[in-house]
A protein has these predicted regions:
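Alpha/beta-hydrolase fold catalytic core
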Residues: 1-38, 60-63, 101-102, 133, ...
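Conserved HGGG/HGGXW glycine-rich cap/lid loop of the alpha/beta-hydrolase fold
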Residues: 25-81, 238
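Conserved acidic catalytic loop of the alpha/beta-hydrolase fold
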Residues: 87-104
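Gly/Ala-rich beta-loop-alpha elbow adjacent to hydrolase catalytic centers
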Residues: 108, 112, 116
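Flexible "cap/lid" loop of the alpha/beta hydrolase fold
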Residues: 117-122, 126-165
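Conserved alpha/beta-hydrolase catalytic His-Asp/Glu region
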Residues: 142, 146-151, 161-222
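Short beta-strand/loop motif that positions the catalytic acidic residue
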Residues: 224, 230-232
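Catalytic active-site module of serine/aspartate enzymes centered on a nucleophile-bearing elbow/loop
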Residues: 254-284
Length: 284
């Protein structure tokens, strides 16, 4: 079921594999270190490679880190079909089951945070015992009745249209608002992130924008009973800080760690603080 793809010379510490979640769909994972599992779910339209500066920090502190690249992105297979949060949550469950993961900390960034909420609301506690929501696009990324926060749906409609006519421009526009200011991240980091984003399929990029636009997770929040940390940039232009406050109000056993100097990319803008907070939470 699993095919070894990379020989790092230290197989007991670093494993890069493909895991089959359906008969014709394999997802790429990075599985490194030993200890309590920390499972990382990337945001739109990135891959598990975005966590490069988290892997080493977590491994050094004695954690096993499992980065899952969602279908349609990065090195994972890119099938046509559904890309809703239920599909992604099921993929994650299948991977954690095959790896026999228990007592894990599930950390999701942006769209990955929204998917992590859906997963945690359905999980019986067999796999995950803590939840970290990082700049999460939740409980709703778009405005709706009784929820006047973040983007209007029409703005996402425009993003979907641009994806099909000029995807590089879509990603360039996205990069301009990814951090607190356009110069918060250096050119090298921005170029690296852009390369990861371009590795996604155009179809998955659009389908996940539809999921981001249409999914309302407000009813999921009350179902989450595990300890939850909400890490969010005060200057986030993609997922406004209002969303963090709404998640805090809806998840009973949760608290917010604000990142005063960060936009959406808090894991890169305040890397040391981010890693320290995640390690502290995972080690409790």
């Amino acid at each position: 079921m699993m095919e070894k793809q990379q020989d790092t010379g230290v197989p007991e510490l670093a494993r890069a594999e493909y895991i089959k979640v359906e008969s014709n769909v394999r997802l790429h994972i990075t599985d490194a270190g030993d200890g309590r599992p920390v499972v990382l779910i990337h945001g739109w339209p990135l891959s598990d490679e975005m966590f490069e500066y988290q892997y080493n920090a977590l491994i050094e502190k004695g954690f096993r880190v499992i980065g899952i690249t969602l279908r349609g992105f990065g090195k994972s297979d890119k099938p046509y079909g559904e890309y809703n949060y239920d599909i992604h949550a099921l993929d994650i469950r299948r991977i954690l089951s095959k790896l026999e993961i228990t007592d894990a900390v599930l950390a999701g960034f942006s769209m990955g945070g929204a998917i992590a909420i859906r997963f945690a609301s359905l999980d019986s506690g067999s796999h995950v015992s803590k939840l970290a929501l990082v700049g999460a696009a939740a409980p709703s990324w778009t405005q709706r009745k009784g929820f006047p926060y973040n983007l209007p749906k029409s703005a996402v409609d425009d993003l979907i249209k641009l994806n099909y006519t000029d995807r590089p421009k879509l990603l360039s526009n996205f990069a301009k608002i990814f951090s607190a200011t356009e110069t918060s991240l250096n050119d090298g980091i921005s170029s690296w992130l852009n390369g990861i984003c371009l590795s996604a399929s155009s179809y998955a990029t659009a389908q996940c924008l539809i999921a981001l636009r249409d999914t309302d997770l407000r009813s999921d929040l009350a179902k989450i009973q595990i300890p939850t940390v909400i890490m969010h940039g005060n200057k986030d232009k993609i997922c406004s800080f209002d969303l963090a406050e709404q998640m805090k109000a809806g998840i009973s056993n949760s608290y917010i760690v604000p990142f005063e100097n960060s936009g959406h990319s808090l894991f890169l803008e305040e890397t040391q603080k981010f890693n320290a907070e995640l390690i502290k939470f995972a080690g409790k």
